[in-house]
Amino acid sequence: MKKIVIIAVLAILLVVISACGNKEKEAQHQFTKQFKDVEQKQKELQHVMDNIHLKEIDHLSKTDTTDKNSKEFKALQEDVKNHLIPKFEAYYKSAKNLPDDTMKVKKLKKEYMTLANEKKDAIYQLKKFIGLCNQSIKYNEDILDYTKQFEKNRYKVESEIKLADNKSEATNLTTKLEHNNKALRDTAKKNLDNSKENEVKGAIKNHIMPMIEKQITDINQTNISDKHVNNARKNAIEMYYSLQNYYNTRIETIKVSEKLSKVDVDKLPKKGIDITHGDKAFEKKLEKLEEK
């Protein structure tokens, strides 16, 4: 009787083991089948990478900004946003949808997702870098615009002063503006020249900006009756607003510059092949599992 029971139990165990083995094999087969879609999505992603001229990043990021460079960087950002990221998201979604029904397949998926996440980090670091470059270009363009605004308002100040009837008020305002400009130049020279970027940020916040605010208040409180001198004052205040914008934007350019300095441009993916690290080893492992 005991023999019959033992034989029956063994038979059941063999059936269970066989069923488990079949389930595992079927799960691996299903994984391999769905992995083909992941591979296809990655090929499409690599094709986009090879066709949007990412390799130009090396050249563009290491040369002085020109109008042509600016347009190329903006075009690159649009290509990344409209073509590269959608293709990557499709690939990543396909990878995340790989089955994980059994322990072995779950382990396999976890191993591949490590590779997929490395690709994700690389792609989004690339996107971030291009975005920072465009930010830097935009801030530099803004600085140029604020400089032009400053000069334009200064010319208006000088023109209105020449038209003034009350020469005393005109002289008083001119003297005040010259004194303010000298004080600002001296402060800038003392605190900004030959200073490190972090020190420049602090100097602008703690010395330059408070001085400009004080000068605006001082000019606003000056008693003026002459129409042209009053117009000169208004333009002088606009001139100082341009200076405020100029220095605020300089702070932003420094922040962007600090972020850019932390990026190793040489390690950014610029061709499709650059995101294939570890793929061959994983594919070989998958092939061996299928052969068993």
Residues of each region from the PLM?
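Post-signal peptide N-terminal segment of secreted/secretory-pathway proteins
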Residues: 60-124
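Hydrophobic helical h-region of N-terminal Sec-dependent signal peptides
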Residues: 6-14
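Positively charged n-region of N-terminal signal peptides that target proteins for export
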Residues: 1-5
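C-terminal amphipathic alpha-helix
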Residues: 34-63, 112-218, 228-292
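C-terminal motif of bacterial Sec signal peptides marking the signal peptidase cleavage site
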Residues: 15-19
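Bacterial signal peptide processing site
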Residues: 21-23
